[in-house]
Curated annotation (Swiss-Prot):
Its main location: nucleus. This is Dehydrocurvularin biosynthesis regulator. PANTHER family: ZN(II)2CYS6 TRANSCRIPTION FACTOR (EUROFUNG), ZN(II)2CYS6 TRANSCRIPTION FACTOR (EUROFUNG)-RELATED. The gene is curR. It comes from Aspergillus terreus. GO terms for cellular component: nucleus.
Amino acid sequence: MSLSHVAPSHDAYGQAKRRKVRKGTHSCWECKRRKMKCRFDPRIASACNGCRRRGSPCISQEFPEDLEEAVMNIGTTSSDGTPFDGRTRATTPSERTDQILTPVSTVREPSQYPRSPEQHLPTGNDTSQRKYERLSRFLHELLPSRADRESIFKASRHSSILSHELLTTPYITLHQNGLQTPESLLMTPQPNSHPVLIARYMLQFALFLQHLPPDLYKEIQGLSEPPRATMERLADAAIYHVTTNEALINSIESLECIMLESLYQVNLGNLRRSWVAGRRAMSLAQFMGFHRPDNQTRYYKALDPKTNYDPQIMWLRIIILDRQLCLLLGLPEGCTDHTMASSETRIANNCPMGRLEQLHCVAMSRILDRNASQPSGRDLTATRAIDLELQKAAGSLPSKWWLAPKLDSASTDLQAMFWDTRRLVLQICHYNLLNQLHLPYMLRPSTAGNKYEYSRITCVNASREVLSRYNSLRSFNRIAYSCRTVDFLALMAAMALLLAHMDSYRDGAENLLANQYLSDRGMIEQVQEHMSEINRLNSDELSAQSADLLKSLLAIDLEKGKGRVSVREAGSEGMLPQDGMGPEEESVVRVHIPYFGIIRIAREKQHATTASKPPVDRSPSSNSDAQLRFSTLTHPSNALPLSPNTTSNPLSFAVADAAAPHEFTTPFAHQQQQPCQPTFSNPGLSLTPSPLMQGGYPDLAAGSEDWAFQRVDMAFFESIMRNVGGDL
């Protein structure tokens, strides 16, 4: 059993005296150090969610902190009595060829699955046929019992089907043959099967458990361990022992395993780990020759003759997921292959959803290429060209295909429900691409007519389409690990739509969005409610933080406030000398984003414009308008104090007169944070770093429990602020 799942025993604590703690203190030592909310899953009450994810001991503050070492020593001997270090260390792939118990070097966490005893380790004297026999037996012993599998399948027979075939099989084939049902997982690999085949089964089973509805947990009785614990144990073992072991990565099934790992991580919300796994899959696929247009040169083998795979589909899936994650995380794409949409015949032979995905794949590459270049006047031309490509892609499908499908939880046709859900998610992805494409121009002021009005309206409409479909999806599907990327897309769409409404209150400008404000606000409130409910049902950190962020932004009531929104560089010609400081600041809204800092929105009196700018005609009613400054933060690349020369990119927009500073100055309610103190103040600039910034970024491979937004928030604001330096 995992050490992190074992409550500290009386033997571990001995006669240690309990400490006196402040009333209301419930967090463990590890969560206190990380300044994270200590949450317990009622289904797994032996350790908090954060410690379970990290694989660290969950020690209550009632006990001395130095007892953690005693707990770490529990179970640090193998079954044959051989002691081994319970803490992990970085290892090389060659070391893990001889020692299968070593965790992957890129994830420095204690192992969350039983370690194999020394007698299971392969030796150099083994023949090629028996080289991995001991590893196979060890992995096979980790599989859930048949009784557990039957109990789970019986409870889920009317609620889910398997989707992992999407990674290797064309849509047309799946439509014809149908997707597999959970009962197909009753047949496990043999104990002497190749480790890769057993690992593939383990990852497939873990993905199936990710899609279990949370209300089924109460119906499944008599299991040896909770389904979520089984999911984590199987996936961790497969990843540590197989998918990250270079000696085992030489077959089509091993590539499939890495793709399953990437999908598993993205479902958890671990976008960064998923991206790393996806890059490993891309490299292996290139070794196998998948990137060749004709794919006639084969550099791979199949371990099981029954394995169904299509190299072109697998290559397409790898590239699509890589580009989706790159857009979310603000990273460069892994390859610039556009061949999936270069042939009209190749596109025409696909089904409608397949054609759209191929065209989306190329559009994502062009957006990433634009974002990777320095901002210039050519950006707008490239943006319009990509927009036309997306219009053409949408036009390749029938008009009725774009109607949002109705998802009925009472339906018994699981195959039809799966494809309707897939269609809805693909529609959301299309509108998200429009958002990503035009976001850098959404808040741009134009000195040449309505140069950027098209981008602004496109972002608004695309955000509405994303949010309406998200509400439809989450009314039907409350599983946190299902359709995970849609949660990130909905959060970005909600923030974009709110900022667009703030931008609509420009001085002297006609508000084209005024009539839609209340309905848009109601839709975002519904999104926030769905995220709160998903967190309640699943104890999901991403949903909790997203709901808190939207709640803070929704506290800004634009019905009462008027002003203007502008995007300017600090120190630029349009910068107001007294913008944001002094006693004239009447109210403040502070929104905390972990590892990003404080977004500070201050309602202030309007100041006169600079002499170099022509005066703006104002009506008498606008003379007392308030201006809000939205201060973004420098990235927490280090813990050094901000220098007086630090610059920022403020946004200005309106907030309600009734807003009081004390109403919004606290960080997320579910996080334990210390009060934030400004480290730098200067006329026209306000920076308030987060306490979490003082230690820099979290680990690069930090999971969603420690870094819920995974840098998606930073990429979003970077995109908004892309072209602030002048009118391009």
